């Protein structure tokens, strides 16, 4: 089916139960993407005096993805980052940006597949449990660094699969309610 969003109409396909991803799994065609220079930005790592190199990805909204590699082993694990404080990105992006921190957990060039762990600080609201466009931006950055097109990425809200081609990106995961609010 089709779903209208601020980023345009997205095509969703129900896949049912998918091993490793859960029940009520959907695949969303997230559309075209644009990537800037790999590692063209510097990103402060909140709660430390360190920084990492980040890659700009436009998914219809701006992202800078920082892959925390072995060179940053003395810095906190992705799970331990302090994302209460907003990361600073240089050069500055006028419209602000979401910032993703990612660790590559496993990669298999023979299978064209990899696994990673990610956390995201979204512009205007801080850390969130997940971010669909952020997951896609992360997979696009990982593809640029490794040549691998298919990524299973774990965020605090769950595990999703992202498949990248030169033309577009697809996001696959379960539809899960993570919270309810009541407006007074």
Predicted regions and their residues:
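Active-site proximal loop and beta-alpha junction motif in alpha/beta enzyme cores
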Residues: 1-130, 137-184
């Amino acid at each position: 089916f089709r779903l209208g969003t601020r980023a345009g109409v997205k095509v969703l396909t129900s896949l049912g139960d998918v091993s490793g991803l859960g029940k009520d799994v959907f695949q969303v065609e997230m559309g075209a993407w644009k990537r800037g220079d790999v590692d063209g930005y510097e990103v402060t790592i909140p709660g430390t005096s360190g920084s990492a190199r980040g890659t700009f990805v436009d998914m219809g909204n701006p992202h800078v993805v920082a892959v925390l590699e072995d060179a940053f082993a003395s810095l906190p694990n992705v799970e331990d980052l302090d994302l209460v404080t907003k990361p600073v990105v240089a050069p500055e992006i006028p419209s602000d940006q979401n910032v993703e921190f990612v660790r590559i957990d496993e990669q298999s060039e023979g299978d064209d597949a990899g696994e990673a762990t990610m956390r995201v600080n979204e512009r205007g609201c801080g850390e969130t449990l997940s971010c669909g466009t952020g997951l896609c931006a992360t997979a696009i950055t990982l593809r640029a660094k490794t040549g691998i097109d298919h990524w299973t990425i774990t965020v605090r809200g769950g595990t999703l699969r992202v498949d990248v081609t030169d033309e577009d990106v697809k996001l696959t995961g379960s539809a899960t309610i993570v919270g309810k609010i009541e407006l007074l």
